[in-house]
Amino acid sequence: RDRSVSRGLGDVYKRQTTGDNAIYGTAVKNGIQLAVDEINAAGGINGKQIEYKFEDDQSDAEKSVNAYNTLKDWGMQMLIGTTTSTPCTAVVEESHNDNLFQLTPSATAVESIQYDNAFRMCFSDPNQGSASADYIADNNLAKKVAVIYNSSDTYSSGIYQNFVTEAEKKGLEVVAAKAFTADNKTDFSVQIQKAKDAGAELVFLPIYYQEASLILAQANKAGFSPKWFGCDGMDGILDLEGFDASLAENLMFLTPFTANATDDATQKFVADFKDAFGDTPIQFAADAYDCVYAIKAAAEKENITPDMSASDICDALKKGMTEITYDGLTGKSITWSEDGEPTKDPTVVVVQNGEYQAVSYTHLRAHETLSDL
């Protein structure tokens, strides 16, 4: 690698492109690529081209730390990553010790950005759990609700806990809550039967799309047809190879982005993404794309240059991120507080005729806490 070339802001991105959550990592990779190409073609950041490199963490905490160290040896000055919560929680310990700026597009656990060098683009687990309960209650989708969640996953268990707390406040009756673990995530007959016997009108699934696809198929065979509601981990279910999309008809989930939105920015992004990668972007691609442009805005506000140390860049970006207001694909007028959490409005989508359709949702600001509700 020619280090004599002006490398601008050495933006470095890490995501998993193999493993259980490969569809998310690939989406993040492509979203970043599109943004970097656009910015570099327009002159870069503060007149400097972005040079970036990515490592595949395979959604594994140990491999994620190894990938971080590889990137640090390469000369990383800032990090967009990781894609999922458990690896991100491990990596943020390292980036904090190094005072290296980190912006995750999609790690939702509170602990993923527990230090002042870390920010996120997505909603946190508490926000998703409480917002989902609010939407279900405020729109009278059901009174009796069951939950199927992954107790071995920080993303799933974090959303579940806050959903149950908010559901009680909103007058929803959680008639069944059954967990599974990473070691037992193929047969959901017990969880489905429990929800069915309890008379659940709606089943909340704060899980990833792989397990959700199995639950929908097995529930169909069991003659159980409640309403289904999930969170951003559900995004991608329609792209799952071998999955019968008709089983997801009327499935609803919380997300900051839908490719069917009619605003000009989204439609341009979708068209450009399809041209570049031959696929329709999911939320994770939009989150990643927004990460690059948010860093650009903060870097330009603080006049960051590539000759600065990673630590000095981090200090500048910590200030810049809390001062910008960013209009992106995943939200308009997005702002960040010092704890790294974004404020933006969520969207609910429903699957209809094999496509995601946006549903208006303006009830909750993303940075509201449970005490605010």
Language model segments and positions:
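Extracytoplasmic "Venus flytrap"
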Residues: 7, 14-31, 55-61, 84, ...
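An alpha-beta-alpha
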Residues: 17, 118-179, 202
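Beta-alpha junction/loop-to-helix N-cap segments that form part of ligand/metal-binding clefts
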Residues: 23-30, 42-112, 121, 180-186, ...
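Extracellular/periplasmic periplasmic-binding protein-like sensory domains
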Residues: 216-289, 350
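Periplasmic-binding protein-like
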Residues: 71-83, 103-105, 146-149, 199-209, ...
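Segments of small-molecule ligand-sensing domains
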Residues: 275-285, 296-355
